[in-house]
Design a protein with these regions (language model features):
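Catalytic domains of carbohydrate-active enzymes, especially glycoside hydrolases
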Residues: 1-11, 233-236, 277-279, 286
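Active-site mouth of glycoside hydrolases
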Residues: 1-142, 147-155, 310-315, 319-322
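Aromatic-rich peripheral "rim/lid" segments of glycoside hydrolase catalytic domains that contact
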Residues: 256-345
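Extracellular beta-strand ligand-recognition surfaces/modules
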Residues: 410-433, 470-471, 486-490
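Exposed low-complexity, polar/acidic, P/S/T/G-rich flexible segments that act as propeptides
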Residues: 434-448, 501-504
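N-terminal targeting leaders for non-cytosolic proteins
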Residues: 346-400
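Short beta-strands within extracellular/lumenal beta-sheet-rich domains
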Residues: 391-413, 463-480, 491
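Extracellular glycoside hydrolase catalytic/binding regions
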Residues: 79-82, 86-89, 93-94, 104-283
Length: 504
């Protein structure tokens, strides 16, 4: 026994030919069908949808509740679903169609706009009618529809959601299901920082037994909050013979927060996942985990898609046991082995970018980072996008213990081509955790010294420690008062807690 359903998110975007009656690229539909067939070959249920077309922030996004030309949107939406439904009309009940993904106007603060919500309801009705009209097994296929942003409260509450009618269903009954997503509390489940890393009863135990700081625990959205929302779903839909699918849920990997307690943090993650899955199952709802394929820091991944190996076996087994036994607290005693990966050498590197993109990127950058020919060269763009070596020299730091270290770049007149920086930072090749403490940061521009009282120290996208000093793209970062130097930049900092990183 294990997972029995795969949700396949499908975006169409520029694969729709607007000039040719909204024809979908046949090669793309072939690929969608190929993936569906993979699932069928394993006896799995499959959910396919129109996924990324409804985001205001996505290039080529067109399926917008707040779009100006709603007639065009409805016409295009109907045409696309007609083609999808016709392609899969002979597939049996293992294939489920989902009308859309997290459809909203891109505003995440405040209640839904009722005019836009009415557009969403209209889309759902077009979806149902269009699929049914394509005939064959689509006349009685199970169909899945969401409310505003697939949000539980905005679907069950008095915000405007209306179930579409299913009068054309040949099964003699409505075959409609409701889709919601659950990622509460978001600061625990999805915010990419290492501050909120504990949740619920499991988190309380870690505070009491292991001495975790109380500030690391989510301050809202505990078990009782979840219970209340799921009860509303059960009362409104399940008890009225309308099935509910939790189409996405999950929380990201924050196990690097404390190097010596990664197992406990992952155990709490397993408990949250198991609680959602177990509570859903106990109320007659189906949970579908969101695995985005990423298994690093802040990833949702549970297995490696290249090796097919489970990367989070404890989380997987907790979810399975929670659903099997309809037990939300199946993961309360979950133990995950602490994985303390220490290194024999740790290094720090200055990173810089001027307003005309004379730069050295982070050491973890895939294109210009530590393992490339560009990393030890301060480079600028010349004519025809040619990379020019400025001749500047870098001094990096090898960190062997707690102490004070300096990284620098010198030998180039920065003021000759720029009046300001876009970015100034220190990148490293060792994992960030909350045991590490950075202080006494001083930026030096030639002879000008600038003390940084509250440096922004965090994990980069690879999970390594990163000190951000200047970033014009981060409006929350305090401005640095400096003059562009004629010869050198340096950053000096003191670091403690390196025994959590360095092997003895």
């Amino acid at each position: 026994a294990g997972f029995t359903t795969v949700r396949v998110p499908v975006s169409y975007l520029d694969r729709i030919d607007d000039a040719n009656n909204y024809t979908v690229d046949s090669a793309w539909l072939d690929r969608v069908e190929e993936v569906v067939q993979y699932c069928y070959n394993e006896g799995l249920y499959v959910i396919i949808n129109i996924h990324g077309d409804g985001y205001n922030t996505v290039e080529d996004g067109w399926f917008l509740v707040n779009g100006e030309d709603q007639d065009m949107i409805c016409e295009k939406y109907e045409a696309v679903w007609k083609q999808i439904a016709e392609r899969f009309a002979d597939y049996d009940e293992h294939l489920i169609f989902e009308s859309m993904n997290e459809e909203c106007d891109g505003t995440y603060n405040g209640d839904p706009n009722r005019e836009y919500y009415a557009n969403l309801n209209k889309y759902n009705q077009i979806f149902v009618d269009t699929v049914r009209d394509t005939g064959k097994k689509n006349t009685h296929r199970w169909l899945l529809v969401p409310g505003w942003n697939t949000n539980v409260e905005y679907t069950v509450g008095d915000y405007g959601f209306e179930m579409p009618t299913d009068e054309k269903c040949s099964a003699g009954e409505s075959r409609m299901m409701v889709s919601v997503h659950y990622y509460d509390p978001w600061d625990y489940c999805g915010t990419e920082d290492l501050k909120t890393i504990l949740w619920g009863e499991y988190g309380d135990n870690l505070i009491e037994v292991n001495g975790f700081p109380k500030m690391n625990k989510a301050k809202w959205g505990d078990e009782s909050y979840l219970d209340d929302l799921f009860t509303k779903m059960q009362d409104k839909f399940v008890k009225n013979d309308i099935p509910v699918i939790i189409g996405e849920y999950g929380c990201i990997d924050k196990s690097s927060a404390y190097a010596d307690f990664s197992g406990q943090i992952q155990g709490n993650r397993a408990y949250w996942d198991g609680y959602v899955a177990g509570k859903a199952a106990s109320m007659g709802m189906i949970p579908v985990y969101w695995d985005n394929g990423f298994n690093g820091v802040y990833g949702f991944g549970l297995f490696d898609r290249n090796t097919y190996e489970q990367t989070q076996p404890e989380i997987i087994s907790t979810i399975i046991e929670a659903v099997k036994n309809k037990d939300p607290k199946a993961g309360l005693d979950t133990v995950v082995e602490t994985k303390t990966e220490k290194t024999t050498e740790a290094h720090a590197y200055i990173g810089i970018q001027t307003e005309i993109y004379t730069f050295r990127n982070s050491c973890s950058d895939g294109k210009y980072g530590k393992d490339t020919d560009y990393f030890n060269t301060l480079i600028k763009w010349g004519d025809d996008d040619q990379i020019i070596d400025t001749g500047a020299k870098f001094t990096d730091a090898t960190i062997t213990e707690d102490g004070t270290y300096t990284v620098s770049v010198d030998g180039y007149d920065f003021s000759s081509d720029s009046s300001k920086l876009n970015m100034l930072f220190v990148s490293t090749d060792f994992a960030f955790n909350n045991t590490l403490k950075v202080s006494d940061v001083v930026v030096k521009c030639d002879d000008q010294e600038i003390a940084i009282d509250n440096p922004l120290v965090m994990a980069d996208d690879q999970g390594n420690m990163y000190i951000e000093l200047v970033n014009i793209y981060n409006t929350d970062l305090a401005a640095l008062n400096y003059t562009m130097p004629k010869d050198s930049f340096s950053v000096t900092f003191t670091i403690k807690g390196m025994d959590s990183v360095l092997a003895a």
